[in-house]
Amino acid sequence: MESLIQHILSATSSLSMPSVDSDKLQLLLTRFPQATLSWLSGIDGLSVHQFKVVATHVIKESYSHLSPSVAVLLAKPSDYYKLVVHGLTQKQWNEFDDKVTDAPRTAISWLYNQILVVGQPWMKSLNEGLKEYLPGWLHTCLRMLANLWFGAERVLHGISHAVSDITTYQPWMSCRRCVAHSPKESLLGEATTTSNPRESSWFSWLLCGGVVAATVYGFYKWVTITETIDRQDLAKQRPTHMQKCYEEVKARLEEESKGFIHDRMEDELTKIVLEPAEIDNDGKVLKSEVAQYLVKNHGRFVRSLVTMAKNEFAGVPKPTEANQLAVWRYLYRVCDKKGVNPSDTQKSISAALPFVFLPSAYDQDQAITMNCDDTKKVLERYADTFRHTTPLQKLVTNPLVGANWTAWARSIFISDPETGLRFAKXGCIEKWQGVQCKRTRVRHPRLRCHFKDRDPKVRSIYRIAGLGDQYEFGLHNNSAANLERGLAERVYMVKNYKTDFVASLDPAFCPAPEPVRGIFKRLDKYKKEIVRRVGRKSPITDEMFLSYYDGPQLTTYSKAVISLSERPVAVQDSYLKTFIKAEKLNLTLKTDPCPRVIQPRHPRYNVELGKYLKHIEHPIYKAIDRIWGGKTIFKGMNVEAMGAEIHKKMCKYSNPCAIGFDASRFDQHVSVEALRFEHSIYKSIHGYPELLSLLLKWQIHNQGTAHTNDGFFKYLVDGKRMSGDMNTSLGNCILASLIVKDLVDSLGVDAQLVNNGDDNVLICSVDDEEVVVKALYDHWMKYGFEVVAEQPVYITEQIEFCQMKPVFDGTQYVLVRNPTVTMSKDACSITPFYTANSARKWCRAVGEAGLSLTGGMPIKQAYYQCMIRNGINKGNIHKSKEFRYGLSYVLHHGKSDRKARPISAATRYSFYLAFGYTPDEQTALEGYYDSLELEWTESRLGIPARTPECLLLRLLPKIPLQPKSPTKPVQRTASKPDLPDSQWQQALAAPL
């Protein structure tokens, strides 16, 4: 060290500089070697490398314990030296020297505080001056800011310069860059009388200002967060009356853990009569009573609601959004059915909803039973009965028994293991014969039957077991007995709707009703509108007609076109060739249904008539849409378009009501007068051509034959709709839509129709519901049709149209087939399964077709994905005649192409409203189908196989009924005029 000081003194003496205070230089080198040498490196004439080597050596060898503390003081060394040399007294310096020896870090902190004291006297005078003129709160704030400023100055002085040194990578040059002349004068012992404003680094002040701003912002955020927490705590506190209700409900629910409760919900309600009933002298109710029920015991009523919800949703439902919506809707239906006051309804539902998702005492008891030691012992004892003990184990356990030696030897030499009774796993492919219906007692003079002593031709229906157990499906044989009943009950006679009709053999049937004479003239105004909008048309060519078809139909009609080029159409081409329709029959709903008959004419006749009708079909549909003022005929639409249009019609009314009505055996009720009205539209569009008139005339008087293996039939019939005619669909749409339009116009109601032939849904306001329902049956009967009005519904999800219901898929409404029916029906096939591979091809084809219709739908998506996963490449099986008339009919005509997608909570809730499957049940069924692996072998059980792994497949869910919105019926004819405003004001001012 001495040599180093001498070297420095000699170096500085060679320069034109005053003498250096060697004692202070030695003390600084001893206490702050690195900082001092860094300053000295800036003196001209001194070797930088030399001082770097010496400083590094000194710090490593003698002052290694001071290196962390010295690094802190490197931030602004020039200011420290100046203040240390000239600002501190000898006493303070000696005190610092003693502290450094004992505790280096404490000494440096003390020195830093002493330095800052030099700059604080001005704060005292400023504080005294401001205190007299400023308010107390402002003076306090300024004092806090000043303290924060100097506190930040103390803490961050070293940090700021350390950062600066690090960024330059030359810490020994920091003094030179900051202040070069001031430290020189200080070490040379010269007094500094003026201060340079540049001595303080601008970065230090900027950083200190940022720290103060950050501190103020932190204080503001602390206050804000504190207020937010207090506000949230206050929001979580119930008002006194609600806290009292909560405690009451909680206490009532806790009573279940103390004893069994037998509640009766009606005992907790008080009836309040708003409007008494009006009854005449004869006892006839002129006006029904209007009453509401108030909840008199909130806790017990809520407990009853919770109990009913748990029974509905099978215990504790999972806490999902879909389940929350379903539970809320169920609780609302219960309260609405009981007539509870709306305010009490909301109060009770809000209190009961959370407790439905919490386990009750009974739920806890169930869980305890399922997991207790007794249960485990019973299960273990049951499992032990299936565990097999090998012959070797028996021999080792008891070698003195000869039977054990025999069994062991048998297992070695014969390899015939001993096992108990085991049932072979049955395959999933089932084959069932067609059904034979009961003979009919109906007779008609124009139906001639000839029976043969032969066995009928037996059809077969195939089933994939394990996919659905709700319903059993069958298939009618094409036999003489089935044909006789189909012709008698679906062509000639209908169910007896008359009370005075006396039948000769079977009183349950009578002839179809005849329309009122001339009734169809009421529809002439609509006919003229259709003809005007469609315009005059001409028949299309053979090539254009053939372009409407493909596959087997194209081949059939191509041959007919060639035949017509050789000889013209004749009356024999209009004769009917009748047979039993091969369709899947729900034998669970109807054990003995009447067979449907198909009555097609010769393809030659269809070609000639089709050239007049095929190209005007959709223009007529559009004309009917114009008459109704919106989309009415839903032919050719996919499931998305139909669902969106139905929801659009429902949204048109504030309180909508949908009334579905099905024309019972529509084709059988089409009379001669109805056919002539329909034909007049076609002839008017084409200008009454002779050939078209002749072709349509042959539809008025029909002659048909039917052949089976065990019989022959010949019959004559006037009128009726023949299911194989070219105008079957078009004619039914025309008749149904115009008859309903006449009903709506005659009643003067605002309504929208959804029509697809004989499937109809009329959407109107709840105010018009009663009027429409009362007039519906009589109005259709005037036209010769029987209709059955279904129960009105009030939400979109419960509208049933073409055996489908709208379900919201997250973006739009989509028509979905009923899963309770289709899970069983789509597992049945009328396409023959010759081999296991043909069954798997059919399964894959059905799965792809179904997924295209129901992608993104609960249960249905998993169902069809299961069929796809278990199937193989479908080949051309989907092009077969049997397949095209099944599930893929909707797909083929609607051109839907949906894909598998995640299922949203809104979709699950909408699916629950439509079909009754709760979200938990949906998830459970999807889990079953996702893990199902089918055994593709033939089943030989002799009975339809069931699915014990998933009992939900055998249960029919209960659809949640939605009550209509409360509204007062519209008074269409006021009995008394309303009072003018002047009289109302007088009435209000009169004393009570």
UniProtKB/Swiss-Prot annotation:
<dbReference type="InterPro" id="IPR043128">
    <property type="entry name" value="Rev_trsase/Diguanyl_cyclase"/>
</dbReference>
<keyword id="KW-0548">Nucleotidyltransferase</keyword>
<protein>
    <recommendedName>
        <fullName>RNA-directed RNA polymerase</fullName>
        <ecNumber>2.7.7.48</ecNumber>
    </recommendedName>
</protein>
<dbReference type="Pfam" id="PF00998">
    <property type="entry name" value="RdRP_3"/>
</dbReference>
<feature type="domain" description="RdRp catalytic">
    <location>
        <begin position="656"/>
        <end position="772"/>
    </location>
</feature>
<keyword id="KW-1043">Host membrane</keyword>
<dbReference type="GO" id="GO:0000166">
    <property type="term" value="F:nucleotide binding"/>
</dbReference>
<keyword id="KW-0547">Nucleotide-binding</keyword>
<dbReference type="GO" id="GO:0003723">
    <property type="term" value="F:RNA binding"/>
</dbReference>
<keyword id="KW-0472">Membrane</keyword>
<comment type="function">
    <text>RNA-dependent RNA polymerase that plays an essential role in the virus replication.</text>
</comment>
<comment type="similarity">
    <text>Belongs to the tombusviridae RNA polymerase family.</text>
</comment>
<dbReference type="InterPro" id="IPR007094">
    <property type="entry name" value="RNA-dir_pol_PSvirus"/>
</dbReference>
<keyword id="KW-0808">Transferase</keyword>
<keyword id="KW-0696">RNA-directed RNA polymerase</keyword>
<dbReference type="InterPro" id="IPR002166">
    <property type="entry name" value="RNA_pol_HCV"/>
</dbReference>
<feature type="region of interest" description="Disordered">
    <location>
        <begin position="963"/>
        <end position="992"/>
    </location>
</feature>
<dbReference type="GO" id="GO:0039694">
    <property type="term" value="P:viral RNA genome replication"/>
</dbReference>
<dbReference type="GO" id="GO:0003968">
    <property type="term" value="F:RNA-directed RNA polymerase activity"/>
</dbReference>
<feature type="compositionally biased region" description="Polar residues">
    <location>
        <begin position="964"/>
        <end position="974"/>
    </location>
</feature>
<dbReference type="GO" id="GO:0016020">
    <property type="term" value="C:membrane"/>
</dbReference>
<keyword id="KW-0693">Viral RNA replication</keyword>
<dbReference type="GO" id="GO:0033644">
    <property type="term" value="C:host cell membrane"/>
</dbReference>
<dbReference type="InterPro" id="IPR043502">
    <property type="entry name" value="DNA/RNA_pol_sf"/>
</dbReference>
<keyword id="KW-1159">RNA suppression of termination</keyword>
